[in-house]
């Protein structure tokens, strides 16, 4: 509103100066006044155009707004659901599909950084970024802030120091996502609720497990790894880590890692924790190939609640998963972008909640995914 008032003031000045031209008795004075008035009028026209854009944003007209979206890797099953829903939501809010550009970072930060620079050069109105590496957030933020473009991070949370920097500088930067500690805790609770009498199949008084991690630099992977086990320990259960490997969120990689772990540790493995469902699907392939049966002589949990994983939970071939609510997250990310375009502020951390998924509610979650 302040911007609109200032533009009206500039316009009034232009009119006054034009009137002054007509009242001058000096040709030189008249010429100079006319030139000044011309410059002022041009400035007013430019400001009025900017104001029109601001008013359109405030009234919900986003048809000419350009949105740049950077996804860390298109082949990630969860991020495919996320980006598809995000695009659809933005279109439903009045953005033109041709003005929404989505780029595949191919799991390479240098590639993604170049894509962000290209979006800046193209003068997009807002950027939504799912970083390849959360540790690169400071560099990304500095690039985008220097260009004066609002920035919404999704799915992969930058560290607390970076988020504090946004707040301290009052930048138009925010993060939309879930607290990965909650997802890890929910994984642990799903296993904990089975009970020690069923979990401790080898009778050593401990929960013997292997951990298949995502990207080791990713904060979500770190928290899920830590808090899934912590949920057991907090209830007095002793744990024994037999193996921990990096699966990089990939199904085929996880299948190979779990196959090797099963060959090495045999029946001693009682629980397989996976940082996401893609890796849990790979783990299940290895478990079945080894002649083991989920729910009978081994337990398996993931995160994301992919459709196939939920079907496996219903069938009893996956113990449980955690719904990474891409619907709420993608809509919240779209709303955050809209707020920035309308000249409004966002909280720097927009939190969404995870949901535990077991056989009791997997059917309900599947219904949401259709």
Question: Which residues does each PLM region occupy?
Answer:
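A residue-level marker of the well-folded mature domains of exported/periplasmic proteins
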Residues: 3, 20-370
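Bacterial Sec-type N-terminal signal peptides, specifically the leucine/valine-rich hydrophobic h-region
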Residues: 14-18
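Positively charged n-region of N-terminal signal peptides that target proteins for export
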Residues: 1-11
């Amino acid at each position: 509103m302040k911007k609109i008032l200032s533009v009206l003031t500039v316009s009034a000045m232009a009119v006054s100066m034009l009137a002054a031209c007509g009242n001058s008795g000096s040709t030189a004075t008249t010429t100079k006044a006319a030139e000044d008035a011309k410059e002022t009028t041009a400035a007013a026209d430019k400001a009025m155009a900017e104001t029109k854009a601001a008013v359109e944003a405030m009234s919900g007209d986003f048809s000419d707004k350009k949105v740049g979206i950077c996804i860390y890797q298109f082949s990630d099953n969860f991020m495919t659901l996320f980006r598809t829903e995000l695009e659809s939501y933005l279109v439903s809010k009045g953005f033109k599909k041709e003005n929404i550009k989505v780029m595949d970072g191919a799991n390479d930060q240098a590639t993604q950084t170049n894509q962000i620079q290209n979006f800046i050069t193209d003068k997009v109105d807002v950027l939504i970024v799912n970083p390849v590496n959360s540790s690169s957030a400071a560099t990304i933020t500095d690039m985008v802030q220097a260009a004066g473009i609002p920035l919404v991070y999704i799915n992969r949370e930058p560290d607390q120091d970076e988020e504090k920097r946004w707040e301290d500088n009052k930048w138009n930067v925010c993060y939309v996502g879930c607290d990965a500690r909650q997802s890890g805790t929910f994984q642990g609770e799903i296993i904990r609720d089975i009970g020690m009498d069923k979990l401790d199949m080898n009778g050593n008084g401990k929960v013997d497990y292997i951990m298949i991690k995502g990207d080791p630099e990713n904060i979500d992977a770190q928290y899920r790894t830590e808090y899934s086990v912590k949920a057991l320990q907090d209830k007095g259960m002793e744990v024994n880590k037999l193996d921990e490997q990096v699966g990089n969120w990939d199904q085929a990689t996880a299948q190979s890692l779990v196959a090797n772990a099963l060959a090495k540790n045999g029946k001693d493995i009682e629980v397989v924790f996976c940082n996401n469902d893609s890796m849990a699907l790979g783990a299940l392939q290895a478990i079945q190939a080894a002649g083991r049966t989920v729910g009978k002589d081994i337990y398996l949990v993931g995160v994301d609640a992919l459709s196939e994983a939920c079907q496996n939970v219903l069938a009893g071939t996956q113990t449980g998963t955690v719904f990474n609510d891409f619907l709420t997250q993608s809509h919240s990310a779209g709303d955050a972008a809209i707020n920035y375009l309308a000249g409004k502020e966002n909280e720097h951390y927009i939190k969404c909640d995870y949901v535990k998924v077991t056989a009791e509610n997997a059917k309900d979650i599947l219904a949401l995914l259709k």
